From Swiss-Prot:
Signal peptide positions (record): none
Main location: other
Disulfide bridges in this chain: none
Protein name per UniProt: Peroxisomal biogenesis factor 8
Locus of motif Microbody targeting signal: 648-650
Biological process according to GO: peroxisome organization
Single GO cellular component term: peroxisomal matrix
Subcellular location: Peroxisome matrix
Keyword tags: Peroxisome, Peroxisome biogenesis
Keyword rRNA-binding on entry: no
Function as written in the Swiss-Prot or TrEMBL entry: Essential for peroxisome biogenesis. May play a role in triggering the protein import competence of individual peroxisomes. It may interact with PEX10.
Keyword Hydrolase: no
InterPro entries: PEX8-like
Length: 650
């Protein structure tokens, strides 16, 4: 008893005794800020917003000093009607921010774990609260965004400190939380859901797909067999994603939630495709999915010259699409069913290639070097069509070429990209398509491009098509609707005109290296022992004389921007002639060596030395492949060139 107790009157002593029996002697218990927060979470005022609640959580969680408060705060939050209600009427945008909020909380707590509540005890208490909620099947769906947010923090924790105190116990909680996330996602997706909650679950699943094993994903796939279509709808059609292409024309600076997770979503799509147990259903779903993606790809063509922001979004979308396509092609290769591949795969490949056709202006900007997934998808689709369905390939050529606005190619990135993709595809199949398509449709268009194209890449692609067309007669072609003899005659009739035009384009449009490839390629298909030579024995002489006459009339005018020999037009054309000397028949070989030497002697200094070295290399190359002809060339060299005391490579 206090010393002053006896000095009090009767009423004073009664009050003192009453205070002593209270839980808090000599004071009145007042609510703490945390008590107010608990009340605010479970019964928010009209002025309370979801953002305000999340800011409270982000502030208070890392500062909590005992497990009981961690558990209590978690349980109160999961009863907050602004995010969770019994009717499961949620806002996708608001509830998605729960994921980001808890990732931030876990990151922050991990970094300030001491000296208050250690991270393991904090984490375990939070998990304990989630486990209590999961026990009620009607409330299990509420746990998903919290669990996913915590799991997203795992990688950043490892980057910060891979072996913190109690790291093995922390890893145990991680594993239990992964199982909980998989289990709650499976239960949450089973049955009818509001669109927002379904979207939330799909994004949440994509965020943790790298931590789930195939068996867990397969269980989710079984309760939600339409999840691949949901993923596609969410990505390409919903306002949370690309919104049917409208996102690209919006001025909103905030990147939509789904677009931020496109990489994860495409990985999830690939994983689910690879383990889908019902092949027929999968094939039907993929057909519809590719329809949606192709339709979206057509919407981007309305942007002829994208801004930097649009380019950035388009790159992300391209990578995501290619990843999905790679998963589709890999799945059918995994099945390895010839009947299925021959009936289903060509249709899928047609839609994939058309999407790539529409997106080629993006590929043209970033390039495909090192882009192995793109190269795999393109090569796989091409192989499928050439193996199973050439008519579809022909249809694609007609549709694509007809859709190109040729007059806009020079001023529109999209039209230029379409034309370049079309030409690349034509180059790959020109030896397989029907003669009618080839001679009546393809070749006239390509010849016109070679003569009139202003864009350098288009010009070079057109030349590549023509070279492939010419070399296609070098071997017998078994394709249907292809008359081999007719092809040989067409090549013979067009070759000299094409070579003349190519030589005219040097050096303004084509480099010496490019013209050299053209000259050497055409020479190989016209000289003796070729199908073209059998059809027209004199054609090789026309080609040879055409190149030789260019050497005769070429001036010593220096080529622009050339640092190494040959630096003159005469030297350049002479080097072209030297490239095809090994192909000349034996009985004409020495006479052409003499003509070439005469041309070389018309040059001086380094240019002459370069041409003589090149001529000697040509003779040595001839000797390796045609020893009899090479022996004649070597003898001639020592008798004529060495006697003139010219520098030569010996």
């Amino acid at each position: 008893m206090q010393p002053w107790y006896h000095k009090l009157g009767r009423q004073g002593r009664q009050l003192a005794e009453q205070w002593q029996t209270d839980a808090e002697p000599w004071g009145v218990a007042t609510p703490t800020p945390l008590d107010y927060l608990f009340d605010e979470l479970t019964a928010p005022k009209p002025s309370t917003t979801p953002d305000k609640v999340l800011s409270y959580l982000a502030y208070y969680y890392p500062k909590l000093k005992n497990e009981n408060n961690v558990e209590l705060l978690t349980l109160c939050f999961l009863r907050c009607p602004l995010f969770f209600n019994d009717a499961q009427l949620v806002s996708f945008s608001d509830n998605y921010r729960v994921i980001e909020c808890f990732k931030y909380i876990m990151d922050k707590k991990f970094q300030i774990s001491q000296p208050t509540l250690p991270f393991y005890r904090f984490y375990n208490a939070l998990f304990g609260a989630l486990a209590k909620v999961v026990a009620d099947s009607a409330c299990a769906w509420k746990v998903v965004p919290v669990a996913v947010g915590c799991l997203l923090s795992v990688d950043s924790r490892n980057d910060y400190d891979r072996y913190p105190e109690h790291f093995q116990l922390i890893a145990t909680v991680d594993a239990k939380l992964v199982d909980m996330a998989a289990h709650t996602l499976e239960r949450s997706m089973d049955g009818p859901l509001s669109n927002d909650l379904l979207c939330l679950n799909v994004v949440a699943l994509s965020c943790v797909q790298d931590k789930l094993v195939d068996s867990q994903l397969l269980r989710i796939l079984r309760v939600r067999s339409d999840i691949l279509k949901i993923l596609t709808e969410l990505t390409f059609n919903s306002p949370y994603g690309l919104d049917n292409g409208r996102l690209l024309t919006k001025s909103n600076a905030n990147t939509p939630i789904v677009v931020r997770h496109l990489n994860r979503i495409s990985f999830l799509f690939t994983k689910l495709t690879s383990i889908h147990p019902k092949i027929v259903l999968l094939a039907d779903d993929l057909d519809l999915i590719l329809n949606r993606i192709q339709t979206f790809s057509e919407s981007v063509l309305s942007i002829p010259n994208p801004s930097e922001t649009q380019w950035s979004t388009l790159r992300v979308v391209l990578f995501a699409q290619v990843m999905m396509f790679e998963g589709i092609m890999a799945r059918f290769f995994q099945i390895n069913n010839h009947s299925l591949n021959s009936t289903v795969l060509p249709t899928l490949c047609r839609k994939i290639l058309t999407t790539l056709f529409n997106f080629n202006f993006v590929v043209d900007r970033i390039g495909t070097g090192g882009f192995e997934s793109y190269n795999f998808v393109y090569a796989s689709c091409l192989s499928t069509l050439t193996s199973y369905d050439i008519p579809t390939a022909e249809t694609l050529i007609k549709c694509w070429t007809s859709s190109v606005a040729f007059k806009k190619v020079d001023n529109s990135a999209t039209e230029r990209g379409k034309l370049l993709f079309d030409l690349q595809f034509i180059e790959n199949v020109v030896n397989l398509v029907s003669d009618s398509l080839k001679f009546e449709f393809i070749i006239p268009i390509v010849q016109d491009l070679i003569g009139n194209a202003q864009d350098q890449a288009v010009l070079e692609s057109a030349h590549s098509v023509m070279l492939k067309y010419f070399t296609s007669v070098d071997t017998y072609n078994e394709a249907q609707l292809v008359d081999y003899t007719n092809n040989v005659k067409h090549v013979g009739a067009q070759l000299i005109d094409y070579l003349t035009l190519s030589l005219d384009q040097f050096p303004a449009r084509l480099s010496l290296s490019q013209v050299g490839i053209i000259v050497e390629t055409l020479a190989k298909i016209t000289f003796p022992d070729t199908a073209v030579h059998e059809c027209d024995p004199e054609l090789y002489r026309e080609l040879l004389l055409l190149v030789y006459n260019r050497c005769l009339v070429a001036t010593s005018e220096e080529l622009p921007n050339v640092q190494a020999p040959p630096k003159t037009r005469h030297g350049a054309f002479t080097s072209l002639l030297i490239r095809i000397l090994p192909l000349i028949p034996f009985d004409e070989y020495q006479s052409w060596l003499e003509r070439t030497l005469s041309l070389a002697f018309r040059t001086v200094g380094d240019e002459r030395t370069y041409l003589l070295d090149l001529l000697w290399d040509s003779i040595l190359g001839t000797n390796r492949h045609y020893p009899q002809k090479g022996y004649v060339g070597i003898q001639w060299w020592y008798e004529h060139v060495n006697e003139s005391q010219e520098k030569a490579k010996l």
